[in-house]
Amino acid sequence: MTARGKNVRIQSLATEDEIFVYDRRFVSEPENVELPELPSPEPFTPDTPPDTLTNQNDLQAWRNLYMARRSWALGLVERCGAMDKSIHEHNERTDIIHRAAGVALENLKTHVGNLENRFQEAQTWANDLLKEQRAALDGWQRALTTLESIPAPKVFPFLGRPSTPKEHRDRPTGTLRDFVDANEVQKAGAEAAAESSRFARQIDDVAEAVRGITADTQRLIDDQLPSGADAADGLQEMITFAKKISSDYEHVIALPNNQKTLANISRLALTHTQDLLPSMLDISAEIHAGLEEAVRRHNTAMKVALDHMRTISAIELRLADVQSQIINLNVQSDAFDVVFSVYHMPMVYGSILVESVRRREFNEKMKADSLTLAEEMAVFRDEEQRRRKKWLKSMGDFISLTETTTPGVEINLQGLDYEWPEVSRNDIESYIEHLKSRPAMASLADGLTQQYKDLDAPTRHQRRRAKAFKQGSIFDLSRSSLLLRSDDMLRSLREEKSKLEEKLKGSESRIRKLEDLLHRQSQLSRPVSGNFNLEFPSSPASPYPDELSRRSSVSSRRMSANQSSEDKTLAQRIVTLEAELNAERETVQRLQKEAHAERLSNTDKIQEAQSTKRDLIDNLEARQREFDEERRYLEGELKKYRLRTEELEEELDRITDSRDHAKQDADERINQLETELQNLHIHTEEELHRANDLLEQMQAQKMTEESLQQRINELEKQQSEIKATEQENLQTLQAAFMNLSPGGAVPAEIPSIIKAIEVLSEGLSIHVKNAEEKMAEAVAENKALEERMNQLETEVQDAKQSAEQRESELAQVRGELAQEKEKLAAVQSELHDERSKLNALQSQHADGDTGTDALRQRVVEDERKLGILSQRLAEVEAQARESEKEVCAWKNKLKAISESEREATTRIEIRGSRAKELSQQLFEQVEKMEHMLEQLGFTVIRQDGEIVVQRASKVNASSGIGDSLAQSGVVSVKPDPSLLDWMQAETAQEETDRYMAFLESLYQFDVDVFGDAVVKRVKDIELLARKWQKEARGYRDKYHRMQSEAHDKIAYRSFKEGDLALFLPTRNQAIRSWAAFNVGAPHYFLREQDAHKLQTRDWLLARITKIEERVVDLSKSMNGAHPDRRSIGGTSDAASIDDENPFELSDGLRWYLLDANEEKPGAPATPGLGKSTVAPAHVDARGSIRLKRTSNGGNVAKTLTKSLDSRRNSSSSKKGPPFAISQRANESTAELARPAEANTPLSPSAQEAASTPEEVRRDQLQGP
């Protein structure tokens, strides 16, 4: 997390100064996990201060004492400095632990705040929903009863829920109850009550959980860890005492040797003993106590922080659960939909009635309009056919053309849906009146009444056609005349016409009153002269003279017969004056009529302009209101989306953390499974070895069994042989007894015979003694042989250690084995001799010698010993055979060891070559990394034993910095290439030294520092790239926006290709030149084209397609031509001057010729229908067609008669075209085309291009 309690993001990781990392194992594990606490510091026992003085009167003894105390003080300061450093480190760690817990708490507070806001919104929504549910549950039975009393005569099969019974659908009349399933509503009412209670309990549970989370969070805030305490600065005081002792020692060193010096030194030493040394001991004890306190505080902080983190983790788990409950907070049953359908059924039924009428009328209108259109097209087709026949008849002598069929139109109506029930407007009105009669359904009746009124409301297209203005501009009336005079439009036009007639009647009555008042006022103040005022009333004047004048003329004519000639002359004069008076009256009446007509026209124009202005202002105000509402809506949406974005980011962080935790668990599980798999592999191998051993044991056992079986067979065979031998011996003994005692009776049993023979064999005792001695020697030799076999076994075990010893021992064993075989052969030969002697003795006994029983017993014992010796001999032979087998096995092992040695030598050589290649690759990689850093603009140096990566500009910034680097031990980190041959050393020690040097050279290049530098560089580049990309995107959007805005705006400050310009005629009537309306950018003239039809226009709105820059140069025609082109006699000179200066500009003036295409071809020459969208431009004035000198004529003459050289050399003539300058181009796109106001300052050139009001209005008065 960051220090602000936010989760760290990869995008902003490079901009964070510090981050806090937490170990999930200690946070999410149960409480029995033990923390790695800091051990208590070792007991501190300072040495006793030196106080031994050999001689009080010897200065050197005092110096030695001072030096010892100085050394003691410095050593104590060093030890206390280490403890003080440990105290500061422990305090820093403790402070970090406190801050980490505080950061986690801040993060939790943010989550809890978001949870409270979300819960408040959810609770508001839930409370409103519960109110609606309670209201629905309280009155659904009454509403269901009410449906029974509301008639519903029309049958709509599609109305109602799918479960609604259909048995009453065929009835011609019924109620709204027929469209509702009463049983389903009853069940839904009971289910809705239970669901509402469950939903309320769910809201209460969520509220209780939120309150619990808030209370636990507040408890954590109240129990927040305190800040770490600063350790007392006793080390500085101890250093001060040590410096005092050192300075005293230096002072003592410089003192002379006399009694006064000794006295001063003694007093100073006493001060040390009483003040300084005890104070240093006390301070050291305080520092050690502070160290113990820091360790204890650190361990306590770890435990408390761990408890807080576990509490925070538990709260966050609960918080995630509550958030999921809030998200999933909803009614899980459709019962309320069924209940609400009871309330909505009256409105739904009424809406269906209105919709039925609307669809029926639309279908009828479509049919009628299609018939009308078909008839009209048929009339057009018949007229066209008659015209073609008439034309062919008149042209029949000149052309030969077959009569073709005139194309016609066939109209078909498609997409008609199935017929709805017939519903009239009276049905709707009666249904609404029935609803109005019920007080509880007044609001439903009002809604249906509004829907019923909307049947007669014009559509959006009809409203647009009813109004002549669309957002401040005249609506396009160039649509087809077909299908536009529908009944709705005619009805709307009649309404508009009636409204306008009423307004016109009121206006006419008001105008009559005003004219009458004006006429009365003018009669009172009419002048005598013939200069009548133009503001006479418009009341109709009688063409006949008034009664007084008529009576006077009649009387004068009557008296004329009785008058004299003078009287007749006077009478004629009176008649003439009366005729003139009548003519003058007629003139006055005509002028009054013209003034009245003009006043009416001006009044209409003013009213039209004011109505246009009001429409424009209303449109602007409506759009402004729409914009304000949209802005407020968008601001609310933006705030909502920001909150949602933060919530999603937090959710994403939690999901990422959970995924990381799951990934960590999966990794641990994978590692555990891999370990178990390895253990299983090892166990499998052991089992395989064990199985192989068992197989070998089984094979050995089988072999042993076979040998035992063979041995049993041999023993059985021997037993049978022994039996046969016994039988033979019995027979032999009987024969011997018979030979020894021919007359005696032969005993039946062998022992009796043997005893008898022993008695007879006493004479052979001497020979038996000799045989015993030889047997004893054979037994001794057998024992020696057994000992030798044991020795051979030990020697075989020793042979495992060395191959050479095995060979020698093997040879020795072979020799000894041969000797033993020879000895065995000798023993066998001796046994054979003994047996032969025994047989000889037996034969001698058989010949007649007598023996005793003792001799017989000796013979039996000898035979027994002989059997034992034979058995031992067999065992020795078996052991000899086993020894031969072991010798063969050792030979095979020796051979395998030799092959292994050869393979190991080959593998070591291969590994040496690979190690060399690997070392070379590592060396090249280090060089590539250094080269990469150099390419990125870094310099890699080693300063004071640490690698430093700096910018090359910083390293080479100044010579002073370079000198300081050189003094601080800056060296290159590039490894030495000679270290690559470390594996080619002659001795093992040398190879080890070279290899360690090679590793040391590689360790000098710190990959972490390299990675940090490269990552920081890449992140800086990415940050800069994102910044530039964002700016480029903003500039591109701004450019597109300005370009789109400029495309539809009139440019008047500067011009470039593609700009929209307003062209007006200039005052030059002779050549009828047209120039662009401008402010500060004169001399942009239009190239006239036939498509422009400028003779019938007062203005032209066109888009510039091409701009040609030209400069007037009259020097070409100054040598032989008059400046005035009207005085030139030749046509060629006139033509050249027209090409160079077609608009009669002064010499050296820069001007531009524009090619432009009309923006809307086919537009009327003047604003449509004799009207204008801006203020009226008609001015009541009379002027002469001749050109007049204005007051500014002198200035114009001065400007046009400047020096040719000065005008050619002026900066205005040397300027480039304005369309080549981006700034003017931007101004042309940014400025709006507004009518020039009276107070807008114009440049002198613009004043030259401007015309007098009379001359400008003269052209405008020629319009319609």
UniProtKB/Swiss-Prot annotation:
PANTHER family: RB1-INDUCIBLE COILED-COIL, RB1-INDUCIBLE COILED-COIL PROTEIN 1. Residues 1190-1201, 1240-1250 have a biased composition (Polar residues). Residues 566-887 form a coiled coil. Residues 551-564 have a biased composition (Low complexity). Pfam families: ATG11 (PF10377), ATG17_like (PF04108). Homodimer. Residues 528-567, 1118-1140, 1180-1264 are annotated as: Disordered. This is Autophagy-related protein 11. It comes from Aspergillus fumigatus (strain ATCC MYA-4609 / CBS 101355 / FGSC A1100 / Af293). Its main location: membrane.
